[in-house]
Swiss-Prot record:
The lineage of its organism: Bacteria, Bacillati, Bacillota, Bacilli, Bacillales. PANTHER family: LEUCINE ZIPPER PROTEIN 4, SPORE GERMINATION PROTEIN. It is found in: Cell membrane. Keywords: Cell membrane, Germination, Membrane, Transmembrane, Transmembrane helix. GO terms for cellular component: plasma membrane. The chain crosses the membrane at residues 242-262, 284-304, 321-341, 351-371, 373-393, 406-426. InterPro entries: Spore_Ger (IPR004995), UPF0353/GerABKA_families (IPR050768). This is Spore germination protein A1. It is a multi-pass membrane protein.
Length: 482
């Protein structure tokens, strides 16, 4: 876009702007010639702009037109909080965001009137992060509303909001929020740098932004947390993390993040610590079940039958007597079926989707057993895995475990128990090397240390919660950093 500065001649200035906006039917171009010789020209998109606001502003500007002078126009522009811009690029950005640009002959600037028409849905309950107890408000697609929701919940005098335009043409409104003195200065600097370096023009949602700014694009694990809950963002800010908001997205990004943080749920702190600790422990157990239960079944049936108790080995052998497929194919058949049912349930309307998932799973499982395509033991195994995968509170993390489960199954089918151990070592090594905005993603020493168990696998009473950062994998903040 043009970086040329405006001049005092209105036609020259319009020649810099109008060609860039092309011939749009919803682009309103109005010209007013006053009796005293002043010429006003204003541009806006009708569908994005409140035309009543534009009309009132123009009436205020041209009042008493017979005696109106440029000095009086400037004073009235100040009264209307019109923002002067000196280049065509900034003017076009403002028009595309729903504002009205006013050009006046004799002035070497365009003046931007804030007349955008906000179209957003009302506040609703979270759909992907439901809790039994806690706030029932979720973010919406309007960035200003989301900023207000966060500030309303985060009553801190040092809460800082920085707005920024991102994308190849710097047209997408975004913002970062952090609490000065709690967030690490290096993390804030890195967030700003990565946002400014984005060269993609089409950013429709924070999910696109997440992929553009994460540390390792080839890792199966999410390195940025996303949430639709204002209370979750507020808690993260108090713990020294940085929030990233994008206009038109109801999900806020939080950095840095760790494996422990991704396994936490907001209602962990709204319930009694004993029950919350038990549920959190079950979540970590569900990781093992999701990743390795199918693999263990394949290993024991294919290679290590001797590790099973005799009665169980006989039962499994009897169940598989008429199954014509090897264990790996049998397991893949059921796992793929479950994934298809899960995907179908997500895409269909809620009542119908739930019915498809429940009825489809029961009917297909029963039919597969009766047709001797799979064993009944495997149906139980796959059902337990499906339930375990739903306990992961972060949807993106759950997807990662589901993908890795298939790799684990192939490892078990090829190398047996050694394949599972090798796969575990590879995942462990990857996690310990992974970072999130320079902070460790998984630190075994800190994660399993008794000193830090107050907010990792278990949650002790809130009075024992550290004042600075409530997760052992989360970076500590020096008091001297801002």
């Amino acid at each position: 876009m043009e970086q040329t500065e405006f001049k005092e001649y209105i036609h020259d200035n319009l020649a810099l702007v109008l060609p860039k906006l092309k011939e749009n039917d919803d682009l309103v171009k109005n010209k007013k010639m006053l009796a005293n010789g002043l010429v006003f020209y204003y541009l806006y998109f009708s569908e994005m702009t409140d035309e009543n606001k534009v009309s009132e502003a123009i009436k205020t500007l041209i009042k008493d037109e017979e005696t109106l002078t440029l000095d009086q126009v400037k004073k009235r522009l100040d009264q209307l909080d019109a923002r002067p811009v000196e280049t065509a690029k900034k003017t076009i950005e403002s028009i595309l965001n729903g504002n009205c640009a006013v050009f006046i002959n004799g002035l070497d600037k365009a003046y931007i009137l804030t007349t955008g028409k906000k179209k957003t849905r009302s506040l609703t309950e979270p759909t992907t992060e439901k809790v039994v107890r806690g706030p029932k408000v979720a973010f919406v697609e309007d960035i200003d509303t989301n900023l207000a929701l966060i500030r309303q919940r985060t009553s801190h005098p040092k809460l800082i909001t920085k707005k920024i335009m991102i994308g190849e043409n710097k047209l997408k409104p975004a913002a970062i929020m952090y609490i000065e003195g709690k967030a690490k200065k290096s993390v804030i600097k890195e967030v700003k740098a990565r946002l400014k370096n984005i060269q993609l023009e089409d950013i429709q949602d924070s999910g696109t932004l997440e992929e553009l700014i994460e540390d390792n694009k080839y890792s199966p694990f999410p390195q940025i947390q996303n949430t639709e809950r204002p209370d979750k963002v507020s808690s993260a800010l108090f713990n020294g993390r940085v929030a990233i908001l994008v206009d038109s997205s109801p999900f806020v990004l939080l950095v840095p993040v760790s494996l422990g943080i991704l396994m936490q749920s907001p209602d962990d702190y709204y319930e009694r610590w004993i029950s919350a600790s038990l549920i959190r422990s079950l979540r970590f157990a569900s990781i093992f079940i999701t990743l390795f239960l199918s693999s263990i079944y394949i290993t024991l049936v294919s290679f290590h039958q001797g590790l099973l108790p005799t009665a169980l080995a006989v039962t499994i052998s009897a169940n598989r007597e008429n199954v014509p497929f090897p264990p790996i194919f049998e397991a893949l058949l059921m796992e793929v079926t479950i994934e298809l049912l899960r995907e179908a349930g997500l895409r269909l309307p809620n009542p119908l989707g739930q019915t498809i998932g429940l009825v489809g799973g029961v009917v297909i499982g029963q039919a597969a057993v009766e047709a001797n395509l799979v064993s009944s033991i495997l149906v139980i195994v796959v059902s337990v895995i499906a339930l375990a995968s739903f306990t992961v509170p972060q949807y993106g993390m759950g997807l990662s475990f589901r993908v890795l489960r298939f790799i684990s199954m192939f490892s078990a089918a090829i190398l047996g128990l050694y394949g599972i151990i090798l796969f575990m070592l590879v995942v462990y090594t990857h996690l310990t090397r992974q970072t999130s905005f320079g902070s460790p993603y998984f630190s075994p020493n800190g994660f399993f240390s008794l000193k830090n168990t107050d907010d990792s696998i278990i949650r002790l009473p809130i009075k024992n919660k550290p004042k600075e950062v409530n997760n052992p994998n989360e970076p500590k903040t020096d008091s001297t950093e801002t």
